[in-house]
Structure formats: structure tokens, C-alpha cells
Amino acid sequence: PYRRQRQMCIRDSITAARLLDCDADYVAKLEADLKRFPPMQISKEGYLQEWLEDYKEVDVHHRHVSHLYGLHPGNLISPEATPELAEACRMTLNRRGDEGTGWSRAWKINFWARLGDGNRAWKLFKSLLHPAVDAATGGHGSGTFPNLFCSHPPFQIDGNYGGAAGVGEMLLQSHEGFIHLLPALPDSWTAGNFRGMRVRGGASIDLDWKDGRATRAVVTALVPGKFTVKMPASAVRAEVKVGGRTRTYKKPVFSLELNKGEEAAVYFF
């Protein structure tokens, strides 16, 4: 993943310098460096290449999928912005399979959530919670210990943190510059709510859903700014109330201008 980590670090440094209007000479150097990164490539068989050359995979089912870093936690790949690369990631995950150690399963939960497949993410989450200790033999493997520690088989905190992050990704995403509500809701999560989840850009989100459909959300600005919201797939329109004003949106993406501490109540239909 290190190549994509460096690529994103340089890209974000350029963005920060431009926002702050500083370090012009350094930005020019970084821009030249950014062009040196090889592009992400799709193999002849359709999966995302792990290496620069299209080598034949020695272990098709290996638990490591670090070449998908651009999908998660990165934001270089998404179904909307780069559909071909996203599909190549999907094929990679299907080839590698769902099995693996705790951290590997946790990461795959996040990958599938980023691809918008809540059912696959939920399936992996349930496998992450599979008892690690065999009641009959006392032996243990991957899964979760009775104290809810993730098992590699030795204790591995990656699975706990990563699994929790995966649930968050199923319910709310903001890595593409907009607030995406219920981007990967599993079919079995028919009703529920969350409160106070934070998104990039400085907002807090509350949301309720019933019968698999979002009913109401509250966007609270923690800083003044413009917040772009993408409606859940189940919604056809949204009524937004800010202060004493109400506005209706029928397009799937809309923007809200909010002051610090201001709330926008969004009702979905």
C-alpha cells in the first residue's frame, strides 16, 4: 500500500498548500513527483494488479489485499469516480475470498462497504464474530474470543477497530467530498438509528431509518461551511428545514450552507 499512501500524501500536501496559498516552489516539485507514480492497472483477467507487471498470482486466495488501499482507507477508487477500478477491486475480493485472519476480515468489511455491498459486508462482520475457541477441543483460530477480543488466533486489535469502522462505513461515508447516507445498508438491518457520527468537513450526523428506508436525518455544522449531501438510494425527494425555512430537493445530491451550530433537519420521501 505504500505507493498509494505516498501518492495520497503528496496529493493532499499540494491541496493544503494551495488552500493556504503558500510554498509555491515546493508545490511545483510535488506536482512533478506526483506524475512519477505508475497508474493503478487492471490485469488481463480483470482484477486489480498487485504489482507493476501482470504477474500470475501464486496464491489466489491469500488474505493480504493491501493493493486495494486506494479503495479503503484511501479515496483513489470509488464506484462513482472510477467504476472500472472499483469493479477490478470487486473481482480481486471475490478471487481472494472471505476467509482470513481477524484484521483481514475487518479490512474486507470496509472494502465491501466502500463498494456499496452492505450484505457482503454484514456477512463478513458476522464471520468476524464467529467464536474463536472450539468448545469441544479448546483449540482456537480466527474469530472472536469470549471477551470480544479479535483473534488472529492471538489477540489482534486490528479486527476490533476495523470491524467497528466497517459498521460506520456501512451507515455513513464522506471520503468523496459529500455526505453519503446509508451507502451500504444490509437488507437485514430493516430499522435503526445512529446519533452524532462525524463526517469530513466538520459536521455531525443523526439518522433514522425504517423498513430499510431513511426517514429523517439531522446535519449539525460544527464549523461554518457548505455541506453536500447524497440521499439514500431509497429516497426520491428530501424536505430540508433550516431555522424557519423549508426547501424541497428532488435531485439525489444537494448542498446546505450552514453556520456553526446550525442544524438542518432532512426528511426523506
Task: List where the protein language model places each region.
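Single conserved hydrophobic/aromatic residue that forms the stacking wall/gate
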Residues: P1-R6, I10
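Active-site core of glycosidic bond-cleaving carbohydrate-active enzymes
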Residues: R11-S174, F178, T215
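Non-catalytic C-terminal accessory modules of carbohydrate-active enzymes
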Residues: N119-K250, F254-F269
